[in-house]
Each structure stands twice: as C-alpha cells, then as structure tokens.
C-alpha cells in the first residue's frame, strides 16, 4: 500500500509547499480537491481546463517531487434542489473532464442528497416514520438520484473516466453498504467506494465488516479516524449537530489516526483491505480540531508507515 493525502489537509500551504512537505514526510500520492465543499486551494479548475500548458506544468511539478496523483475530488451535493445543486453539478462535471484530460482515473465524490418534492433544501431521511418519510425517499431515489447518476456515469464513461468513488457519508443518500449497493446495482460498476472508515464509526457500523461486504467495489481509501465520547454519546446518542470547534461537547469527533482506534485496529484495517483485493493508496484526511494540520498529518504518516510495513 501507499501513503497518500488529500491536499486540503494542508490547505493553508501553497501548492509548492504542499509538494515539498508531502515529499519530506514520505507521502507518495496526492488527492487534489477541485471545488464544491472544498475551496480548492491547490487547483485552479477553470484555468486548468482551458490550458494544456497549465495541466502539464501541474503534473510535472507533482512528479518532480517524486509524487503521483491518486484522484481528483469534487465532493458536494449535485442533486441539491435549485441553483445550489446546479452549481455543484457543474463543478462535478468539470472535475471529471479535468481528470480525463490529466489521465487521472479516479474521482472522489459523494452521492448527494435531494430534498423531498418541492423542497428548497436537501433532506436526509434516517427513519421510516412518519409515513411521508417513505414518500420522500421514493422520490429521492426514483425521481432524482438514480436518473442523475445514470446520466453522470454515461458522461464520465464518454470521457474515459471509469471510477467514480463515492464516500459513504452522513447527509448523503449513499451513506452505508446497503445504500451503496442500491445505487451501484442501478447504474453500474463505474460507481465504486471511496472507503472512509471514520463516517461508518460514528454511524455505528463496523468498517472491517463493511470492507468485506464491499470487496472489489472499493476504488480509493481515506485514512481518517473517529473518537466516540462515551459520556456524551451515552446520554444523547451519536446524532450530533454541535460545532466541530467544540469537540469536548460532541458525541464524536474526527481525529488523527490512532487517537480513536489503536494501532492494532489499523493493522486489521489494512489486512482486511488487502484480503478484499485493495492494495493501493491510503489518503490521509486531517480534520482533528486538537492538532495542527502538519502535526496531525505527520502523526498519521508515522502510524500508517508502521501498519503497512
């Protein structure tokens, strides 16, 4: 396996400084965000789409530091009602086109979450009651999500991009193994998983069992940890809308590798991935409020180096 990083983890650094820092830490692959929920600190999407010289220079600088590109990322909600969704869909398609032009075979993203009929905002349904929840879900899946993804898969395939890697994430219609297979079975094998165990942890799933169930549908992996606060979670459960900037008040928090699950767990994680046929990048994503980005990334690199040895 190879150690990678999504460059938003060091988003305060310039493109050149990110390359220098990643190479110095022993990172081998980089994932670049192109917009939507990311500010895209290292990719000028429109300019790179227009300029072959800019694309060549970008790839050359990455290679000059002994690095390769694991994926482009456009995580957002392209099926959000109204103009919001249209803007995210445009960035999604532009990112897929850029991946095609750059010879990058993977695009990391999320499924999106529509609203209900006539809604102005997205609506993540997590219960089967009251009865209108079923009506909303049927509309979301049958009228919006599945048709959208059939069209997006055709668009990607037309550009030669064959791996759209969905992150199983809260506030998305595809947030679990079961919902992933529902979409995959409807739209085909271009859709795979960007496997990030941290979200499954706070939702109460077992990432190791999920790896076994997903098998060769895992196309890309994020390395991120979650720590459950047993006191808060024991009182309130794990559904928590308090700000990430107040981690002590929350039921769970994203943390640096090893601060949620111990090193032995991460060894099992890598072993399960290999058993499933995945022997590729582990892309570090730093979102730990308690550590600086560089400190968190450095600690994550050290842990991964131990567990993949």
Residue ranges and their predicted role:
Residues 6-10, 33-37, 74-77, 112-114, ...:
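Active-site beta-loop-alpha junctions enriched in small/polar residues
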Residues 17, 61-65, 78-192:
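Active-site acidic/histidine proton-transfer and metal-coordination neighborhood
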Residues 16-38, 102-103:
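Catalytic domains of carbohydrate-active enzymes, especially glycoside hydrolases
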Residues 33-57, 114-118:
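Glycine-rich, proline-tolerant flexible connector loops at the mouths of alpha/beta enzymes
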Residues 41-49, 142, 177-181, 201-277, ...:
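Gly/Pro-rich active-site loop or hairpin
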Residues 293-309:
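C-terminal helical cap(s) of enzyme catalytic domains, especially alpha/beta-barrels
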Residues 5, 22, 30, 62, ...:
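Conserved, mostly hydrophobic/aromatic
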Residues 19-24, 48-70, 94-103, 150-159, ...:
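Acidic (Asp/Glu)-rich catalytic clusters
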């Amino acid at each position: 396996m190879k150690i990678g990083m999504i460059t938003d983890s060091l988003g305060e650094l310039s493109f050149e400084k990110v390359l220098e820092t990643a190479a110095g830490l022993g990172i081998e692959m980089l994932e670049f965000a192109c917009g939507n929920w990311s500010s895209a600190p290292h990719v000028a999407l429109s300019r790179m789409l227009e300029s072959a010289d800019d694309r060549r220079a970008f790839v050359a600088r990455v290679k000059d530091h002994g690095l390769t590109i694991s994926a482009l990322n456009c995580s957002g909600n392209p099926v959000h009602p109204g103009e919001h969704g249209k803007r995210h869909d445009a960035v999604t398609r532009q990112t897929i086109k850029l991946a095609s032009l750059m010879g990058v075979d993977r695009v990391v993203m999320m499924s999106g979450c529509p609203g209900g009929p006539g809604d102005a905002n997205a609506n993540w349904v997590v219960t089967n009651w009251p009865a209108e929840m079923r009506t909303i879900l049927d509309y979301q899946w049958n009228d919006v999500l599945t048709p959208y993804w059939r069209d997006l898969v055709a668009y990607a395939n037309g550009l030669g991009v064959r791996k759209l890697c969905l992150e199983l994430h809260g506030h998305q219609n595809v947030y679990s193994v079961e919902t992933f297979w529902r979409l995959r079975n409807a739209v085909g094998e271009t859709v795979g998983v960007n496997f990030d165990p941290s979200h499954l942890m706070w939702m109460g799933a077992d990432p190791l069992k999920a790896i076994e169930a997903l098998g060769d549908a895992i196309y890309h992996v994020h390395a991120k940890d979650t720590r459950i606060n047993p006191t808060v979670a024991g009182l309130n459960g794990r559904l928590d809308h308090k700000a990430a900037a107040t981690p002590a008040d929350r039921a769970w928090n994203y943390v640096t590798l090893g601060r949620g699950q111990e090193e032995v767990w991460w060894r099992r994680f890598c072993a399960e991935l290999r058993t499933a046929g995945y022997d590729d990048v582990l892309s570090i994503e730093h979102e730990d409020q308690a550590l600086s980005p560089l400190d968190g990334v450095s600690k994550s690199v050290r842990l991964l180096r131990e567990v993949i040895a």
